[in-house]
Curated annotation (Swiss-Prot):
<protein>
    <recommendedName>
        <fullName>Protein rogdi homolog</fullName>
    </recommendedName>
</protein>
<dbReference type="GO" id="GO:0008021">
    <property type="term" value="C:synaptic vesicle"/>
</dbReference>
<keyword id="KW-0770">Synapse</keyword>
<dbReference type="GO" id="GO:0010467">
    <property type="term" value="P:gene expression"/>
</dbReference>
<dbReference type="GO" id="GO:0030282">
    <property type="term" value="P:bone mineralization"/>
</dbReference>
<dbReference type="GO" id="GO:0007613">
    <property type="term" value="P:memory"/>
</dbReference>
<dbReference type="GO" id="GO:0005635">
    <property type="term" value="C:nuclear envelope"/>
</dbReference>
<dbReference type="GO" id="GO:0022008">
    <property type="term" value="P:neurogenesis"/>
</dbReference>
<dbReference type="GO" id="GO:0043204">
    <property type="term" value="C:perikaryon"/>
</dbReference>
<keyword id="KW-0539">Nucleus</keyword>
<dbReference type="GO" id="GO:0030425">
    <property type="term" value="C:dendrite"/>
</dbReference>
<dbReference type="GO" id="GO:0007626">
    <property type="term" value="P:locomotory behavior"/>
</dbReference>
<dbReference type="Pfam" id="PF10259">
    <property type="entry name" value="Rogdi_lz"/>
</dbReference>
<keyword id="KW-0968">Cytoplasmic vesicle</keyword>
<keyword id="KW-0007">Acetylation</keyword>
<dbReference type="GO" id="GO:0030097">
    <property type="term" value="P:hemopoiesis"/>
</dbReference>
<comment type="subunit">
    <text>Monomer.</text>
</comment>
Amino acid sequence: MATAMAASAAERAVLEEEFRWLLHAEVHAVLRQLQDILKEASLRFTLPGPSTEGPAKQENFILGSCGTDQVKGTLTLQGDALSQADVNLKMPRNNQLLHLAFREDKQWKLQQIQDARNHVSQAIYLLANRDESYQFKTGAEVLKLMDAVMLQLTRARSRLTTPATLTLPEIAASGLTRMFAPTLPSDLLVNVYINLNKLCLTVYQLHALQPTSTKNFRPAGGAVLHSPGAMFEWGSQRLEVSHVHKVECVIPWLNDALVYFTVSLQLCQQLKDKIAVFSSYWSSRPF
């Protein structure tokens, strides 16, 4: 019995020594690795900082779709804003070519990119507050930090992977409709959003429902992409979507950012799992 107790005490002493090493050395090694990865992610978002000089560079992207050639054009991205748009729309009814372009004095902020960037910045801030000189005293303290960092990274990723669901009146009321010169025709709506690593542009063509129409008017709810036949009320008019044209372009640095988020989340989870292994040995006391 005494031998077994001594062996148990020795095993516990070894585990406690390993756990102290985990808290004092390995945790900080993981935090350094996380900071390095997230700083790379922040560079993709062109985070403003004291070393940043001048505006973010402009990047031109050609819009395309495998299913239609009704819409062609380019979008110019400058950091988290669309600075230019040059779009040609072939109208289905008469094949007339309609040219849409942003006003020169306007930029359209992409809130998804801005929010994702802010969440990355917050994650970096949380990690920087626990520098090499900080001594973690318990596993619970590490878990709390990892949970906070993972929350910011999950939110950053979600902003890029989950576009907002908007109703057609919300799209019609958006400031994006006032970005164009000449003004958008009243029978067109335009929406722009990020989906994963793609910048998507959707053009909705509308027609008015006559008061004598026998169609059962049923306003559409919110959606990322509305379908032909979707109805809504705008002002004194009832309108229906007749055609939908969606084109997109791949933004390579968004793909990089998503990869960095995934790798960082995996590192956080691996550290949490290591803490959990030790906690299972002495779950009856704080760890």
